[in-house]
């Protein structure tokens, strides 16, 4: 028993030894390992390598073999690297317990949350990379404890707040990347303390304020990225102290002032990008000192002056991009000494003179981009002989001369865009034989001869634009077989013959051959060009039928085959063109009925079938075309009645033309539902009944019902139409004019007044009833007369004399009134300087340089209304704004009043634009833009800063007065409200023809939107210098419809627009692309202001903002690249 007890003790001892050994092996994982396991708890997702290695192992006392871990000699964690490991979760505060950590790389994962402040405890950290994650909130200010930190990457996160000042006091910091966050506030002054900093990237944040001058103390800086922030102020001169600087990007900020950069200290500078700022002055000549400079990029920096010749000293320069500035003068020939130059971009400036032949010496030059300047003369032959050029972009200049045969030897040439110049002569026949051309754009020159056959010899041609020249002959078959062409424009030439067959699987997407002499059938092979989105073959001599193969073009959005000699019926297969938005086959000889399956065109906005031989009644499916806004099917043989379902096309806004179709019956009642319709033509039919249905068409600007069999009175809402276009109602012998219409209507119309039925009816009253009525009427009149006499006697004592002006405290003194009356000889006719809707204007010169304009208002109201007017005028007199005419004084009497204004020496905007000698006051675009902005400011003030708001109701050039500096001042504001005391709307129209908003055409609805419409018309006058209703316009066309029509016919092409609608005086000025872009933006604003629907118009505050933005136009482009 005793032995058994001893054996048990021995076994128990062994068990205890085994158990203790096991426990020791579990707890022997060192503290760094345990810290890592704690960090693991904060992670939502880790790669398999982590789950398989990050765990307790009896045979390992350290985590040195774990995935992503590297240890130092003491078996402490020195590096944690999870880069690109698809880890998600948060970085726990336990990270601060890794005291030996030297490298922490968690880049390119999905970490979120804040950066733990405990990182400041990792005092041995040399590299901290948390880039490309989702960290948010502020950068902890404890990082300044990392005295050994050399590299800090925090870019591409969601960090916010200001930078800690202490960040730049980390003594050994060499690399700091903070780009692509949402950091705000100023750049700390402490940046100058970062003596060891070599690379600093802070771009694509929200930093504001000035770049600190102290940055010049960061003497080790080589790379500095500050672009795409909100920095202001000037470029600090202290940057010139950074002798080690190789790369400087400060583009896409709002920096101002002169560029003072380029000291002898910049020898190491390789790349300089100052683009998209608002600098003053020119390109600093001192940049010629930066002898190592490889890329100089200052795009849209608001630079002016000339290009310094000192840039020719930069022998290593490969990229020179000074585009989109206001540089003037000529290109210095010294640039020909930049022997390494690869890219020269000087486009979108105001450069003049010839292109220097010295540029032909640049043997490495690949891209020469001089477009949108004012260059003249010929392109030097040395450039045509270049064997390095791949791109030659010189469009929109005044260049001339022939295209030399040497052009055909440019073996690397890919892109040649010469459009909108004055090149003449033939295109060299061999062009394309020796090079792989990709883009050839010669539109808008004076080129003659035939299309060269080898343009697509290299089978890479994507764009071939030869429109608006004098070319003749046929299209070479090789061009039709060129599958790579995407955009093909030959419009407005003298080309003839048949169109070539197009290859299968052609890349063609845009085809415009309009206005030539092409003949024969339209090739069915066009239907194989599946990418086609636009076809314009109008104004040619094509014959035969429309090929049904065109129905294969499911991406086609625009088809114009108008004004040809096409015949036959419309192929039903076209219904498969389900993307079609505009379809025009007008002015052909097509016949038959319109296929019902065209109802598939759900996106169609414009349908033009006019001047053909279509029959079978107006198509019943039209209401299914919900987006249809223009329907022109005039002068066909549709016959039948107008289907009532047309009234269901709610978006029918612009035009409904059913004229000349032999239509019968009455106008269907549903047509009255087209309340947005602006143009209606149902003339030359056999329609009967009354026009009462048209009462509801309140948006109509033009209507023609002539040559039908209508009867009865013309609706009240068409009174204005009858006055302006009486012929639109002629040929209806039984139509008549209501007695409520103005007498002037009858003077211009052959129609008679409607019979007054009340006069022809017998009263049916007996003799004694008539006597009784007469007696009672006499008694009533007597009572009224006695009452009026009594009232007059009561008021006589306190009433002013009839011709005496009434004064209040706020009104001008009687002495000034006497001077005004004396200066105008009691308002003598000879002092008249204008007549307006509200009265006559006189010029009163009171000596000592004081000249006033005196407006005499005539009232029809009684004296109480005048007292109300005094309060109203008093309110107007307190309105103060630089773009509003200031009321200097006013006087009232019973029947009229005088209002005194400062005299404007330049007269009105109408005088300046349309006066007898407008050339004496020609406004350049800058002046016109300032007028547009000034008027917008004035109207915005009236609409939103006056209480109550003032709606002008008669904005037009005559009411915009110009001071000696051509600053605009709006006049007559408040007078419409002063002279009309109704509350909501009136039956009479307030405003001037051409400026009246559609909703105000036949009654006045008070709203700011009507002023916005009138303002839009004024903008169009500034752009076009045409009157609102100009004699040059087609009949029944105002400036709004004329501009919309012009833009529509040009497919919104910028060049076409400039030549079509813009004032010819501005054309030379608009060679500057930024100004041309301004004109486009202002035109778009005008069209937005003149939309039919008042709710769709911008407010005047919107207009001011857009115009302010236009002032600083800058094309969007990434400044991350120097190109």
From Swiss-Prot:
EC number annotated for this UniProt entry: 2.7.11.1
Highest taxon of source: Eukaryota
PROSITE patterns assigned: LRR, PROTEIN_KINASE_ATP, PROTEIN_KINASE_DOM, PROTEIN_KINASE_ST
UniProt modified residues of type Phosphothreonine: 824
Stretches of the chain found on the membrane's Extracellular side: 29-769
Keywords, sorted A to Z: ATP-binding, Cell membrane, Glycoprotein, Kinase, Leucine-rich repeat, Membrane, Nucleotide-binding, Phosphoprotein, Plant defense, Receptor, Repeat, Serine/threonine-protein kinase, Signal, Transferase, Transmembrane, Transmembrane helix
Reported modifications of this chain: N-glycosylated.
Topology in membrane: Single-pass type I membrane protein
Family according to the record: Belongs to the protein kinase superfamily. Ser/Thr protein kinase family.
Quaternary structure and interacting proteins, as annotated: Interacts with PEP1 and BAK1. Interacts with BIK1 and PBL1.
Protein name as catalogued: Leucine-rich repeat receptor-like protein kinase PEPR1
């Amino acid at each position: 028993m005793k032995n058994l007890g001893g054996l048990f003790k021995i076994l128990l001892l062994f068990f205890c030894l085994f158990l203790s050994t096991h426990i020791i092996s579990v707890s022997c994982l060192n503290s760094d390992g345990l810290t890592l396991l704690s960090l693991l708890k904060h992670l939502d997702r880790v790669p398999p390598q982590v789950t398989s290695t990050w765990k307790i192992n009896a045979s390992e006392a350290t985590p040195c073999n774990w995935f992503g871990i590297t240890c130092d000699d003491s078996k402490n964690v020195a590096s944690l690297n999870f880069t690109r490991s698809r880890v998600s979760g948060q970085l726990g505060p336990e990270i601060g317990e890794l005291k030996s950590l030297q490298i922490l790389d968690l880049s390119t994962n999905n970490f979120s949350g804040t950066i733990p402040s405990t990182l400041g405890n990792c005092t041995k950290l040399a590299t901290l990379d948390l880039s490309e994650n989702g960290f948010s909130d502020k950068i902890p200010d404890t990082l300044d404890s990392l005295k050994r930190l050399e590299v800090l990457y925090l870019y591409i996160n969601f960090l916010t707040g200001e930078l800690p000042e202490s960040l730049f006091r980390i003594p050994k910091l060499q690399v700091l990347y903070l780009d692509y966050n949402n950091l705000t506030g100023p750049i700390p002054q402490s940046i100058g303390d970062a003596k060891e900093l070599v690379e600093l990237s802070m771009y694509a944040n929200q930093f504001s304020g000035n770049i600190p001058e102290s940055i010049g103390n960061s003497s080790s800086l080589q790379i500095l990225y500050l672009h795409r922030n909100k920095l202001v102020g000037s470029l600090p001169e202290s940057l010139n102290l950074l002798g080690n600087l190789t790369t400087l990007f400060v583009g896409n900020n709002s920096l101002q002032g002169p560029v003072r950069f380029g000291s002898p200290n910049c020898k190491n500078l390789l790349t300089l990008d100052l683009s998209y700022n608002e600098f003053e002055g020119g390109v600093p000549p001192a940049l010629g000192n930066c002898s190592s400079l490889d890329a100089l990029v200052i795009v849209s920096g608001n630079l002016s002056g000339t290009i310094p010749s000192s840039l020719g000293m930069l022998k290593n320069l490969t990229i020179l991009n000074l585009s989109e500035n206001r540089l003037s003068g000529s290109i210095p020939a010294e640039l020909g000494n930049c022997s390494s130059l690869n890219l020269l971009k000087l486009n979108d400036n105001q450069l003049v003179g010839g292109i220097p032949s010295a540029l032909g010496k640049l043997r490495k030059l690949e891209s020469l981009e001089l477009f949108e300047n004012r260059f003249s003369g010929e392109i030097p032959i040395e450039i045509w002989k270049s064997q390095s050029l791949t791109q030659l972009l010189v469009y929109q200049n005044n260049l001339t001369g022939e295209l030399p045969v040497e052009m055909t030897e440019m073996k690397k040439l890919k892109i040649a865009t010469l459009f909108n110049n004055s090149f003449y002569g033939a295109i060299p026949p061999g062009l394309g034989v020796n090079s792989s051309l990709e883009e050839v754009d010669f539109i808008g020159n004076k080129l003659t001869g035939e299309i060269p056959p080898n343009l697509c010899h290299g089978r890479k041609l994507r764009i071939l634009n030869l429109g608006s020249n004098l070319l003749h002959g046929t299209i070479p078959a090789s061009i039709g077989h060129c599958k790579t062409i995407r955009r093909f424009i030959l419009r407005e030439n003298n080309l003839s013959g048949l169109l070539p067959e197009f290859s299968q699987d052609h890349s063609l997407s845009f085809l415009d051959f309009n206005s030539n002499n092409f003949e024969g059938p339209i090739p069915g092979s066009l239907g194989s060009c599946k990418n086609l989105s636009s076809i314009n073959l109008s104004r040619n001599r094509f014959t035969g039928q429309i090929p049904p193969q065109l129905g294969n073009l499911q991406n086609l959005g625009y088809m114009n085959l108008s004004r040809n000699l096409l015949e036959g019926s419309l192929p039903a297969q076209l219904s498969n063109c389900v993307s079609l938005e505009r379809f025009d086959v007008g002015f052909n000889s097509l016949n038959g009925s319109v296929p019902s399956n065209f109802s598939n065109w759900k996106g169609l906005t414009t349908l033009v079938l006019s001047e053909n031989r279509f029959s079978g009644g107006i198509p019943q499916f039209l209401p299914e075309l919900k987006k249809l806004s223009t329907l022109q099917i005039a002068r066909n043989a549709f016959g039948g009645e107008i289907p009532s379902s047309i009234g269901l096309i709610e978006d029918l806004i612009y035009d409904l033309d059913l004229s000349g179709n032999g239509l019968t019956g009455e106008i269907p009642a549903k047509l009255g539902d087209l309340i947005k319709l602006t143009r209606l033509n149902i003339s030359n039919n056999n329609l009967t009944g009354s026009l009462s249905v048209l009462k509801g068409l309140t948006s109509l600007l033009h209507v023609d019902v002539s040559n039908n069999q209508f009867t009865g009175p013309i609706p009240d809402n068409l009174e204005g139409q009858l006055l302006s276009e009486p012929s639109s109602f002629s040929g209806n012998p039984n139509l008549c004019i209501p007695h409520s219409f103005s007498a002037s209507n009858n003077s211009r119309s052959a129609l008679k007044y409607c019979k007054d039925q009340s006069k022809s009816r017998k009263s049916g009253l007996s003799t004694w009833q008539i006597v009784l009525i007469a007696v009672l009427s006499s008694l009533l009149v007597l009572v009224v007369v006695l009452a009026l006499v009594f009232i007059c006697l009561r008021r006589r004592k306190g009433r002013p004399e009839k011709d005496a002006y009434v004064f209040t405290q706020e009104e001008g003194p009687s002495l000034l009134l006497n001077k005004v009356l004396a200066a105008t000889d009691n308002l003598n006719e000879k002092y008249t300087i204008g007549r307006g809707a509200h009265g006559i204007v006189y010029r009163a010169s009171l000596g000592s340089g004081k000249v006033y304009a005196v407006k005499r208002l005539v009232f029809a109201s009684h004296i109480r209304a005048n007292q109300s007017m005094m309060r109203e005028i008093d309110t107007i007199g307190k309105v103060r704004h630089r773009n509003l005419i200031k009321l200097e004084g006013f006087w009232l009497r019973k029947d009229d009043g005088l209002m005194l204004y400062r005299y404007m020496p330049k007269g009105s905007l109408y005088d300046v634009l349309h006066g007898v000698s407008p050339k004496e006051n020609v406004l350049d675009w800058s002046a016109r833009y300032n007028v547009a902005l000034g008027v917008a400011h004035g109207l915005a003030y009236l609409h939103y800063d006056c209480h109550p708001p003032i709606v002008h109701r008669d904005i037009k050039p005559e009411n915009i007065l110009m001071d000696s500096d051509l600053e605009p001042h709006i006049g007559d504001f408040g007078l419409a409200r002063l002279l009309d005391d109704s509350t909501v709307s009136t039956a009479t129209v307030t405003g001037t023809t051409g400026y009246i908003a559609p909703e105000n055409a036949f009654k006045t609805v008070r709203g700011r939107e009507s002023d916005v419409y009138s303002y839009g018309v004024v903008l169009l006058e500034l752009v076009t210098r045409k009157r609102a209703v100009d004699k040059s316009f087609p009949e029944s066309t105002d400036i709004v419809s004329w501009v919309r029509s012009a833009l529509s016919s040009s497919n919104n092409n910028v060049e076409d627009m400039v030549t079509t609608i813009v004032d010819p005086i501005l054309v030379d000025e608009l060679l500057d692309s930024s100004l041309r872009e301004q004109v486009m933006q202002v035109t778009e604003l005008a069209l937005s202001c003149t939309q039919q629907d008042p709710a769709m118009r911008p407010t005047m505050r919107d207009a001011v903002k857009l115009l302010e933005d236009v002032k600083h136009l800058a094309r969007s482009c990434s400044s991350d690249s120097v190109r």
